[in-house]
C-alpha cells in the first residue's frame, strides 16, 4: 500500500456525499434546465441550457455532479459538473439524473465529480442497473450503501486540482480545434 494511502479511510458513500439533495423550485417557476441531450459524453462541462418552466425533475446547484442513471446514457459517459448557474441559483433537469453533492468539510465538490466519473465507480453503477432491456436504471440505494476509500480533504483537493488542470487543457484544445474547423 502506498504510504500516502494509509491516511485514507473507508466510508459508506451516503455518509460523505449527498444524493439528490433537496432544493426548492416552485412549479411554473422559470429556471435553467439541462436536458439529457446537453450532457456530452466524457465532458466535464455542460454545453448549454434552456430557460424553461419547472414542472419536475432533478434540481441542482453549481458544484453538483449530474450522472445519467438510465441506459444507454450512463454507459455513454453522460456525467457533468455543474458550473453554469449564477450564485445561489437552482437549476433543474431530467428525472434520469442522480445528483451528487459534496458535504462541506468532508468531501471536495470537484473530487466528487472525478470520483463519480472514475471507471471503477462507473463500472459499479452500470453493473447495478435493473429493469427491462433498453430501460435499465442504476440502483441508487446500492450506490448510497457502497463502501469507498477516500483520502483526507486536503488530498482530495490536490487530486481534483491535478485532474482539473488536465480537463482545462483538454477543453482548450477542443476550443482550438473548433476554431480551426470553422
How would you label these PLM feature ranges?
Residues 6, 32, 90-91, 114, ...:
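Residues that recognize and position ribonucleotide moieties
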Residues 1-23, 149, 153-160, 164-182:
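Non-catalytic DNA-recognition/assembly elements of restriction-modification systems
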Residues 57-58, 62-118, 131:
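A short beta-sheet element
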Residues 117-122, 126-129, 147-149:
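Well-ordered mid-protein domain cores that form the structural environment of catalytic cofactors
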Residues 15, 111-114, 124, 145, ...:
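Short, solvent-exposed alpha-helical surface patches in well-structured domains
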Residues 11-68, 73-75, 81-82:
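Sequence-specific dsDNA recognition surfaces
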Residues 89-98, 130-160:
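A short glycine-rich beta-alpha junction/loop motif
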